[in-house]
Amino acid sequence: MVRARHQPGGLCLLLLLLCQFMEDRSAQAGNCWLRQAKNGRCQVLYKTELSKEECCSTGRLSTSWTEEDVNDNTLFKWMIFNGGAPNCIPCKETCENVDCGPGKKCRMNKKNKPRCVCAPDCSNITWKGPVCGLDGKTYRNECALLKARCKEQPELEVQYQGRCKKTCRDVFCPGSSTCVVDQTNNAYCVTCNRICPEPASSEQYLCGNDGVTYSSACHLRKATCLLGRSIGLAYEGKCIKAKSCEDIQCTGGKKCLWDFKVGRGRCSLCDELCPDSKSDEPVCASDNATYASECAMKEAACSSGVLLEVKHSGSCNSISEDTEEEEEDEDQDYSFPISSILEW
């Protein structure tokens, strides 16, 4: 009799627990995605078995959620073959409570969807003129540079005020930095490393394009910085009194080009393929010949084994309109970009 009286209560408790379990499972059944694509489908799976509230609690603008509780095979087919999961529900429908991070703001686009756009705070910028960026490009003002940094170049900074120049004339570098003209005849502001450790072995010796032996790459960079213009690397090892390129051993797939002007050779990269671009500007080379581009000039130099340098942009029969380029340093080396020599 006692067991009969308690049976209905136990059954009710069991049903209650079962209902609660089903409710909790239905609340958890769903998939969280990192973005909603232009095709309206969810892409980049973040986590499975999450409720919409849990998924959207991240605060990310692009986070989306799907309600379907499907197996791994279906998820795989959605991601690989179908361009994402269907029935995608974005977490954010408006800009309310959207945190886009520093330098960005949430705005509704033409499709009435919230989007984070670059909107740097330019209110404290005092210099309104053009600036030269670390990428060697001129920006119409610092605010334009900040927008470019926000979009695709997080390391972009202002080098100096004014347009990017070909010489250090009228370049005022901030702080303790110094103006240096690199091998491509562009002015950069760098910080000179005045202390270089003594080389551990003779393998660190480098021969500069000035015919001077430097103890290490650090010593070459230091000399370049203090000089204010690119010295450039001729070849690895101590400088030798070479009579021709036959006396110089180049490494790293480089080829020796002879500079008849100073009677020295330098190792240069000669594997560059010139792109078929109509936008390239012709150059007048040191042999007084006009080449379709600087790349074409380098190609001719590598073919002949004789060093060629740019005298000025444009045809040799024309006078360069850029007065700054007329003052370019003659001892340039097109084989080594600033990143390989001027790593401050």
Swiss-Prot record:
Region called Disordered, residue ranges: 314-344
InterPro entries recorded: Fol_N, Follistatin/Osteonectin_EGF, Kazal_dom, Kazal_dom_sf, Prot_Inhib_GrowthFact_Antg, TB_dom, TB_dom_sf
Transmembrane segments: none
The protein's name: Follistatin
Phylogenetic lineage: Eukaryota, Metazoa, Chordata, Craniata, Vertebrata
Glycosylation sites recorded in the entry for this protein: 124, 288
Substitution effect: residue 33 to A: More than 90% loss of binding to activin A/INHBA and FSH secretion inhibition
Tissues in which the UniProt entry reports expression: Isoform 1 is the predominant isoform in serum but is undetectable in follicular fluid. In the embryo, strong expression is seen in the palatal epithelia, including the medial edge epithelial and midline epithelial seam of the palatal shelves. Less pronounced expression is also seen throughout the palatal shelf and tongue mesenchyme.
A GO BP entry: pattern specification process
Domain TB: 30-103
Species: Homo sapiens (Human)
Consequence recorded when altering residue 55 to A: More than 95% loss of binding to activin A/INHBA and FSH secretion inhibition
